[in-house]
Amino acid sequence: MTHQYPALTTEQKRELQDIAQRIVAPGKGILAADESTGSMAKRLNPIGVENTEENRRLYRQLLFTADERMDKCIGGVIFFHETLYQKADDGTPFAKMIKDRGIVVGIKVDKGVVPLAGTNGETTTQGLDGLSERCAQYKKDGADFAKWRSVLKISETSPSELAIMENANVLARYASICQQNGIVPIVEPEILPDGDHDLKRCQYVTEKVLAACYKALSDHHVYLEGTLLKPNMVTAGHSCPTKFSNQEIAMATVTALRRTVPPAVTGVTFLSGGQSEEEASINLNAINNCPLTKPWALTFSYGRALQASALSAWRGVKENEKAATEEFLKRAEANGLAAQGKYVSSGMDGSAGQSLYVANHAY
């Protein structure tokens, strides 16, 4: 029976939509700085920096203390639990520092992927236990949005019906719990770029996965205006012999979204999925210039694609902090322009052109 039991009050809905709109205001996107402690090792070890709490704090500090140029192109920052409770050198909590700049604070709330028995190496995401209490606490501590990542992969046998259904359901349950606590959920069903599949296959799988997600969100009475979607762009697999143009990637991506994502959704914040910094900006720009009608904000939620050059410039040396912050700002501004279809690429030179692909990427 389709009886309606109101899940949210008008005030709650208004607050959620307002938060979502602030994050994806024109020319703004998200800095994903929510790498787990283990993932930070993969960032710091290659540049010769020990993965300690203090080094992680110093690194995040150089991102968060970037000058006012950041405020024009970053609408939200996703924190990891540890970072939410860290402070800058002057004693200001990072969360307060970001909030005071008019940037929305977010928090990663999932607890990582676990194997889904009976599938060929597929996964589901854990973290629903105690999520409501954690969300209530995070809201008190300054967070207004959250992120939960589900992972699907393309192969002969996957994604299976089971993996699609289970991940859609867990994302919807998470989204519902967030909204009850005044937190805007970012729904992230990432289809990994591993494999030799072509653009068509990725588009087809992306459509099936997104359709399942929005069916589940509807079943769970999630208020779509108070959500954001964080999908992969539609690209061929990394081992695909055929190379596709930025325009082809944009057309396949926007077509998949138009077929599955309701216009009520406030914004789509793409993940970079191991693309190089430059590639992630060029593709986002092409998506915004795609000649199809696009009812949502189409912007970025990038981790590596905003940070790779900054990390290389920093190398853990205090004297390099300024240069590292400049590299971060350069990418942030590039993506702010790309989110408006106004980015002009300066070529694929240097570290910005280096692929950031990691096979079977786990955060």
Swiss-Prot record:
Q: Which SUPFAM superfamilies match?
A: Aldolase (SSF51569)
- Active site as annotated: 230
Top-level taxon in the UniProt lineage: Eukaryota
Write out the transmembrane intervals. none
Which residues of the sequence carry a binding annotation for substrate?
56, 147
Residues of the site described as Necessary for preference for fructose 1,6-bisphosphate over fructose 1-phosphate = 363
Name the tissues where it is expressed: Expressed in brain but not in liver or muscle.
Q: Which reaction does it catalyse?
A: beta-D-fructose 1,6-bisphosphate = D-glyceraldehyde 3-phosphate + dihydroxyacetone phosphate
EC number from the UniProt entry:
4.1.2.13
The record, for InterPro entries, names: Aldolase_I_AS (IPR029768), Aldolase_TIM (IPR013785), FBA_I (IPR000741)
The terms under GO molecular function for this entry are:
fructose-bisphosphate aldolase activity
GO biological process terms, semicolon-separated: fructose 1,6-bisphosphate metabolic process; glycolytic process
For this UniProt record, give its keywords in alphabetical order, as a comma-separated list.
Glycolysis, Lyase, Schiff base
The record's comment on protein family reads: Belongs to the class I fructose-bisphosphate aldolase family.
How does it associate, per the subunit comment? Homotetramer.
- Can you say what this protein is called? Fructose-bisphosphate aldolase C
Organism of origin? Carassius auratus (Goldfish)
Q: Gene that codes for this?
A: aldoc
